[in-house]
């Protein structure tokens, strides 16, 4: 197991995952440099060369995550999701640092050729739909080509459940209201509580796993409709207010996979503890007041 003497370097520290990862690392008293995307533009190769040093463990949380916006901003999406990670990988390889690159379930399309869907393994064939998905897969490929010892971690349906714009946060607010809420029932995946994901990434950093593509998501599979009803139940609202509809009733610029649940089997085989079941994680996320799940955007003190 790798020691805690290594400096943890977090990119995208102002985002949903990056801010929670930074907060968790601070609570654990780790030596850390956490920089927001405004402080560190990962599309600038000189920045990576300047910041990353020998022995660092870099966790790349920086990403262009506007799935629909990527359809009209392809160049930006590829710059942040593919070229930027490549710069990080090259810098890590050059100085002798480690790299954990966060990717997405969007690299899969849910087509099992008529067979019964089952959670995707890291070795399953990818088939990204849309600009965002293609840019994230390109990032994975660029990272591993530049630095084969890097670790790529795919996750899915990440949420805080707080005051933000993630699915659970939105459903939580709707549960407090009245009337019917229509939610698609033909998109199935692995909801992942951001706090659990942050802890999983730190465990991976400590384990020193290299040169692998792994999946890290809360256990279990559910549709968006089922997830929404679970949110209502946890909030004490009537789950019958949530009604199933098809994705065709909510057309979006970018396509969504019909099924993108992720298997944790390889995560466990790597000696890591799989994340708990999604329903247990959801209960934890919703047990606290909504505003308490939002991270203070002022980053904890870090040192160069």
Curated annotation (Swiss-Prot):
Binding site for NADH: 15-17, 41-42, 63-65, 132, 136
GO cellular component: cytosol
Keywords: Carbohydrate metabolism, Magnesium, Metal-binding, NAD, NADP, Oxidoreductase
Amino acids binding dTDP-beta-L-rhamnose: 104-105, 157
Pathway this chain belongs to: Carbohydrate biosynthesis; dTDP-L-rhamnose biosynthesis
Its EC number(s): 1.1.1.133
Protein name per Swiss-Prot or TrEMBL: dTDP-4-dehydrorhamnose reductase
DNA repair among keywords: no
Molecular function per GO: dTDP-4-dehydrorhamnose reductase activity; metal ion binding
Cofactor annotation remark: Binds 1 Mg(2+) ion per monomer.
Classification via CDD domains: dTDP_HR_like_SDR_e
Cofactors, names only: Mg(2+)
Gene name per UniProt: rmlD
InterPro entries assigned to the protein according to its UniProt record, in alphabetical order: dTDP_dehydrorham_reduct, NAD(P)-bd_dom_sf, RmlD-like-bd
Enzymatic reactions: dTDP-beta-L-rhamnose + NADP(+) = dTDP-4-dehydro-beta-L-rhamnose + NADPH + H(+)
UniProt record similarity statement: Belongs to the dTDP-4-dehydrorhamnose reductase family.
Binding site for NADPH: 16-17, 41-42, 63-65, 132, 136
Catalytic machinery residues: 132
Domain of life, per lineage: Bacteria
Function: Involved in the biosynthesis of the dTDP-L-rhamnose which is a component of the critical linker, D-N-acetylglucosamine-L-rhamnose disaccharide, which connects the galactan region of arabinogalactan to peptidoglycan via a phosphodiester linkage. Catalyzes the reduction of dTDP-6-deoxy-L-lyxo-4-hexulose to yield dTDP-L-rhamnose.
EC class (word): oxidoreductase
Entry keyword Transit peptide: no
Gene Ontology BP, a term: dTDP-rhamnose biosynthetic process
Annotated TM spans: none
Note: Was identified as a high-confidence drug target.
Site (Could provide a fine-tuning to achieve optimal pKa matching between active site and substrate): 104
């Amino acid at each position: 197991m790798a020691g805690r003497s290594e400096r943890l370097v977090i990119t995208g520290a102002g985002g949903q995952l990056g801010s929670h990862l930074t907060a968790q690392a601070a609570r654990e008293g780790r030596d850390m440099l956490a920089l927001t995307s405004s402080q560190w533009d990962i599309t600038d190769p000189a920045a990576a060369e300047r910041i990353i040093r020998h022995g660092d463990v870099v966790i790349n949380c920086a990403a262009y995550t506007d799935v629909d916006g990527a359809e009209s901003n392809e160049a930006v999406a590829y710059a942040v999701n593919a070229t930027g990670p490549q710069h990080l990988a090259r810098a890590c390889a050059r100085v002798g640092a480690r790299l954990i690159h966060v990717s997405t379930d969007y690299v899969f399309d849910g087509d099992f050729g008529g067979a019964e869907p089952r959670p995707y393994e890291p070795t399953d064939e990818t088939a990204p739909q849309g600009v965002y998905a293609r840019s994230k897969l390109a990032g994975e490929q660029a990272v591993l080509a530049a630095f084969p010892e890097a670790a790529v971690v795919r996750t899915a349906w990440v949420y805080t459940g707080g005051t933000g714009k993630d699915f659970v946060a939105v459903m939580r607010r709707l549960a407090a209201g009245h009337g019917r809420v229509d939610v698609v029932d033909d998109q199935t995946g692995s909801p992942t509580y951001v706090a659990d994901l942050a802890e999983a990434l730190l465990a991976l950093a400590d384990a020193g796993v290299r040169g692998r593509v792994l999946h890290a998501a809360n256990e279990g599979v559910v549709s968006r409709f089922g997830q929404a009803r679970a949110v209502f139940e946890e909030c004490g609202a009537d789950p019958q207010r949530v009604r199933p509809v098809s994705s065709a009733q909510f057309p979006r610029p970018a396509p969504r996979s019909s099924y993108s649940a992720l298997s944790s089997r390889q995560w466990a085989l790597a000696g890591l503890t799989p994340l708990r079941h999604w329903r247990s994680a959801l209960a934890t996320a919703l047990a606290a007041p909504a505003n308490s799940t939002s991270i203070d955007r002022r980053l904890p003190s870090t040192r160069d």
